[in-house]
């Protein structure tokens, strides 16, 4: 390809093309030149290059630079979330993923939702996972793996719901009994050893 020019945009564009061609060393060279000329988008592109090279530490640095520049988008937030997920830091990942899905222009809603479901499950927030999976299967009914996840979470929610209702009922019954006891009866029950 033949893209001439020495502006930050020219370097960033060439770096992006090299990235797509799998020529990561050339991509880094061009993108570092773009960064030297204060290209914000070059942070995103070079982060993707590092990620493709299996270097999540450097990728995270450049994704974070991109986010800190105020130019963050849902793709960058998802990428940062996935880096945290790979580290096993699911609560940290949720921070990025939730910010990403809350953005005005979300270009990767499906990926964000999939990652949110995973993170909510790993952090034992099954109610949130259930809410997202319901929305997900409505939006993407052809996704067979999401259908299985839906069934799993539905069964989990049904299994935990009766236990919660039973506990509430026992608490309400206990309160009703306590309300009808005289102070002497209540004291007698407290002094009686459990069998």
Where are these regions (language model features)?
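Start-of-helix register in tetratricopeptide repeats
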Residues: 9, 41-44, 75, 108-111, ...
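Canonical tetratricopeptide repeat
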Residues: 13, 45-48, 79-82, 115, ...
């Amino acid at each position: 390809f033949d893209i001439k020019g020495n502006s930050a945009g020219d370097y960033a564009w060439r770096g992006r093309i090299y990235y797509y061609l799998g020529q990561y060393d050339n991509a880094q060279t061009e993108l570092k030149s773009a960064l030297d000329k204060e290209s914000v988008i070059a942070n995103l592109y070079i982060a993707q290059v590092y990620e493709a090279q299996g270097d999540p530490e450097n990728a995270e640095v450049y994704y974070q630079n991109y986010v800190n520049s105020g130019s963050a988008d849902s793709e960058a937030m998802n990428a940062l979330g996935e880096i945290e997920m790979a580290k096993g830091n699911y609560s940290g990942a949720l921070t990025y993923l939730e910010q990403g899905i809350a953005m005005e222009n979300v270009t990767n809603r499906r990926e964000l939702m999939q990652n949110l479901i995973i993170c909510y499950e790993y952090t034992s927030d099954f109610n949130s996972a259930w809410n997202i999976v319901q929305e997900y299967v409505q939006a993407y009914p052809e996704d067979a793996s999401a259908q299985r996840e839906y069934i799993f979470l539905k069964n989990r929610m049904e299994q935990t719901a009766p236990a919660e209702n039973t506990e509430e009922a026992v608490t309400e019954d206990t309160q009703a009994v306590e309300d009808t006891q005289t102070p002497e009866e209540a004291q007698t029950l407290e002094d009686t050893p459990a069998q």
